UniProtKB/Swiss-Prot annotation:
Lineage, highest ranks first: Eukaryota, Viridiplantae, Streptophyta, Embryophyta, Tracheophyta
Taxonomic source organism: Arabidopsis thaliana
Name of this chain's protein: Probable serine/threonine-protein kinase PBL16
Encoding gene, per UniProt annotation: PBL16
Keywords assigned by UniProt, alphabetized: ATP-binding, Cell membrane, Kinase, Lipoprotein, Membrane, Myristate, Nucleotide-binding, Palmitate, Phosphoprotein, Plant defense, Serine/threonine-protein kinase, Transferase
Membrane topology classification: Lipid-anchor
Modified residues (Phosphothreonine): 65, 244, 249
Biological role: May be involved in plant defense signaling.
PTM sites of type Phosphoserine: 213, 243
Chain residues carrying a lipid of type S-palmitoyl cysteine: 4
Lipid moiety-binding region (N-myristoyl glycine): 2
Biased composition (Polar residues): 18-30
Keyword Kinase part of the UniProt annotation: yes
One Pfam family, short name: PK_Tyr_Ser-Thr
Amino acid sequence: MGNCWCRFEPLNHRVSANAKSESPKEQSPTVEDKHIKEVQKLPSNPKEVEDLRRDSAANPLIAFTYEELKNITSNFRQDRVLGGGGFGSVYKGFIKEDLGDQEVPEPLPVAVKVHDGDNSFQGHREWLAEVIFLGQLSHPNLVKLIGYCCEDNHRVLIYEYMARGSVENNLFSRVLLPLSWAIRMKIAFGAAKGLAFLHEAKKPVIYRDFKTSNILLDMDYNAKLSDFGLAKDGPVGDKSHVSTRIMGTYGYAAPEYIMTGHLTPGSDVYSFGVVLLELLTGRKSLDKSRPTREQNLIDWALPLLKEKKKVLNIVDPKMNCEYPVKAVQKAAMLAYHCLNRNPKARPLMRDIVDSLEPLQATEEEALLVPPVQKAVITIIDEMPKNGLKKVEELKKVEEVKKVIEDAC
């Protein structure tokens, strides 16, 4: 969706390097039997998929034919490709006809995610998970699934189009303008609300693959969670966790999940802490291009998050000191608590939402000219149109330096 689909990782890249292998020899007959039953239970033809979706869906999803998708994407033209990965490709398309009861007065842009002939159990399960979860759940901070296609060997998902793409592309881009502090906190707030909604749903859901490439942005930088292929039903009743295959993305996955396969809402909280730290520093969770001791963001930054003065040294320099210092310190402490190695000591997502709310800028504040830029504009306006003498120019330069120092 938008530029959002530019970095989808193949399934084998999602598994942590420290994950325990799951060879058949290590699996007990009970687990194998359960696996076989799961395969047998999974709906595989269009009617079974539609029946299952209709029985559990809160959102009216549309079952598209493959021929309709060819029309929507101009026959999957190459210049419509938005991105791709291990699952296949994503195309930009336009729906020109009414969608059931919904009128389409003008072409509606959509993102069409085509699974590349992966009809394995895992590939079909991830595709189906998105249909089920996004069919059941509706929230402003979850990407909207419009429909799907389950025809012959084709497995396709149709989403709302997210104009600004992924947080990953915006945060780490060398071409796009740097994200302001206000926008970064808006993104964190929106993503936190999405996770909190999942954790507090009637049937709790653990997202399991929270990372910057899975957070999408609309034109107003509203954040929405996408890609529910690895999402899992959360623990219910007196259960503290669910046991599952170790999947996710290295650098974001919680350490206890990597070690044991025990998945809890706290696993998502840890991943949120990683993303919040990326927003603070402008650095990737893992970056082999940096000096050895700085390649792992958590190892490098975690000891500094509690230090009110030192933490300012790791803030993204692309923001040019244009941020409220106290808010940065509060966000850093929040990230520190999310990254606690003890999952029981991490905050709940609802508490994280409450902590981020006071850090949100008003619409008016977000539109204000940053103090350094404002000072420079003022100085330039005061300059005589016929120019300045050299000594006066130097004086103005010193004034600008002083303003920058004060702002930082």
